[in-house]
Amino acid sequence: MDSSSEKLSPFELMSAILKGAKLDGSNSSDSGVAVSPAVMAMLLENKELVMILTTSVAVLIGCVVVLIWRRSSGSGKKVVEPPKLIVPKSVVEPEEIDEGKKKFTIFFGTQTGTAEGFAKALAEEAKARYEKAVIKVIDIDDYAADDEEYEEKFRKETLAFFILATYGDGEPTDNAARFYKWFVEGNDRGDWLKNLQYGVFGLGNRQYEHFNKIAKVVDEKVAEQGGKRIVPLVLGDDDQCIEDDFAAWRENVWPELDNLLRDEDDTTVSTTYTAAIPEYRVVFPDKSDSLISEANGHANGYANGNTVYDAQHPCRSNVAVRKELHTPASDRSCTHLDFDIAGTGLSYGTGDHVGVYCDNLSETVEEAERLLNLPPETYFSLHADKEDGTPLAGSSLPPPFPPCTLRTALTRYADLLNTPKKSALLALAAYASDPNEADRLKYLASPAGKDEYAQSLVANQRSLLEVMAEFPSAKPPLGVFFAAIAPRLQPRFYSISSSPRMAPSRIHVTCALVYEKTPGGRIHKGVCSTWMKNAIPLEESRDCSWAPIFVRQSNFKLPADPKVPVIMIGPGTGLAPFRGFLQERLALKEEGAELGTAVFFFGCRNRKMDYIYEDELNHFLEIGALSELLVAFSREGPTKQYVQHKMAEKASDIWRMISDGAYVYVCGDAKGMARDVHRTLHTIAQEQGSMDSTQAEGFVKNLQMTGRYLRDVW
């Protein structure tokens, strides 16, 4: 390089470029600014840097031009606001209603989907009857983001129906809990619902003491706050045929809606309505394109790595420990299971419930495949819309599960062992090639066949597979089978039998095996209890069993003050939450807390067969986490003894503890034990407290209302 050549700074080069200097030494008479030979030489010497700078200038000029163009082209438009934050719940947005159109809203509170199905069925028939009406079906939890919005929106409602299930011992369903708390416990609003006409249908089970409590309370509260009831409250009983109860209530609805919604020129209300059979659109894709979906897919997804776990987003959890709790002398079985939640972010509280999704037994799945007459490797996907993306007719289809084989679908997603609903019988009838079988199915689903359906199917606990075997010509397509015949397999709930103070990375479950002969003669094997009994724990194999699980919070909690005395009553697997309670008390004691008296009434058949967790209970007793343990053995000695008998023997002690502020907890069977314990508690209050029957009843009810008498029953 010539020693006389100079290096230009970027600034000097840029100045030269902007003045129009040419690098090829062309005649200065061309458009441009003349530059001296020295400058030209310097530019040529720094040619690479010049190219970088010229490119940068071109890009800069281009950006400026685009900005000017966009600003000028948008000058006459409204400024776009930044998007709002995403709200976890999809709150229903208000929609504009054409003037002159009448509207009503159907709210549902559901745990297993039945109430939602009823709400959508009511809406579909109403749309067919009243073409000019605007009808909305709303998950009551999605109606509003907060209490203030609930009140604001309800004030605008003029016609509404509430289809509400009661869950457990008089509790609202998960999706109705927030609404129920606001509506029942809120401030006195006077007759703020005076413009609302309404009706309520409840879903419950008469075997529970607080039968249909949620529907009763909502119906009463709406009336108290000015609402006008246009149809009587009907309490559906799932212990019988709740479809018949809903059908009867629905028939009361139509005359009232005719008066409110029918126009003089509206003739649609007089036409006979026939409900369409729900059906998914089915696609049979190339399985090789979806192997990942088949391996990892689940109807509800998995939420590992996220912060929110619920029934729709469960947490995949390995089985860490499994052990049998009964002795070899027992002819029954009870399984203890540890779910490993370390590193998942899933947490729980003492007294909470765990929901577990389990697979159907292979023998059950194989029978279903045989009845459907389809190969198990059939790979398909379900869709609730048409190919062009528009929704299929009707709106009662539940969200479809991911693409999978028929075997996977029947294993994970189909409830095959419960008694089929009448709507399922009608769907089977529509695809029965034998006219006699079709007629028989239609009869069982009809009002005329009500008694025979109740006796032949419900009372005998006939399963869906048994019914399909009885009517072999019924071969529904997959879209109908999964939409209208086989309900979605539901999670099983268990009282958690551990405390996070003692087992922060494990959820313990105590599960009795369900293995019994039905009245119809079939051997019924519980889906989840059988799976748990056969689960392979991590301590035995790295290829261990796992299940999608989630935690459901409960109000079944120890008093905030550990010095408050507690009375616990729970025979059999009713011991589960109390094992967690005692672990909690032990941890508190080890931390130096002062504990109040704790008495536990436990019951089992025989000390040598089914006295579960005996060593642990004795340890809690010895170390002081438990003050007194009273065990009733129903199969030892000449007479059967149950927990209520032990309670009667300790009546004076129980009354003294209650008088000192004790909390009373009951866990176990709702149909027998819980009722007997409740009656015994009533008797103790009456006799020990010198009360008459009415006073004793009021006393026990007050214990419940103040949260000192809590039940976890099933």
UniProtKB/Swiss-Prot annotation:
Q: Which organism is it from?
A: Catharanthus roseus (Madagascar periwinkle)
Membrane spanning residue stretches = 49-69
Instruction: Return the InterPro entries for the record.
Output: CysJ-like_FAD-binding (IPR003097), FAD-bd_FR_type (IPR017927), Flavdoxin-like (IPR001094), Flavodoxin/NO_synth (IPR008254), Flavoprot_Pyr_Nucl_cyt_Rdtase (IPR001709), Flavoprotein-like_sf (IPR029039), FNR_nucleotide-bd (IPR039261), NADPH_Cyt_P450_Rdtase_alpha (IPR023173)
Q: Which residue stretches are annotated as topological domain Cytoplasmic?
A: 70-714
Enzyme class name: oxidoreductase
* Ion transport listed as a keyword: no
Task: Give the reactions, separated by semicolons, that this protein catalyses.
Answer: 2 oxidized [cytochrome P450] + NADPH = 2 reduced [cytochrome P450] + NADP(+) + H(+)
Cofactor: binding comment:
Binds 1 FAD per monomer.
Q: Where is the Flavodoxin-like domain?
A: 104-254
Q: Which residues form the FAD-binding FR-type domain?
A: 312-559
Function as written in the Swiss-Prot or TrEMBL entry: This enzyme is required for electron transfer from NADP to cytochrome P450 in microsomes. It can also provide electron transfer to heme oxygenase and cytochrome B5.
**Does the record's keyword annotation contain Membrane?**
yes
Protein name stated in the entry: NADPH--cytochrome P450 reductase
- The residues exposed to the Lumenal compartment are 1-48
Q: Which domain of life is it from?
A: Eukaryota
Q: Which GO terms describe its cellular component?
A: cytosol; endoplasmic reticulum membrane
Where does the chain bind FAD? Answer: 492-495, 510-512, 526-529, 714
Note the CDD domains from the entry.
CYPOR (cd06204)
Q: What is its EC number?
A: 1.6.2.4
Record's bilayer topology term: Single-pass membrane protein
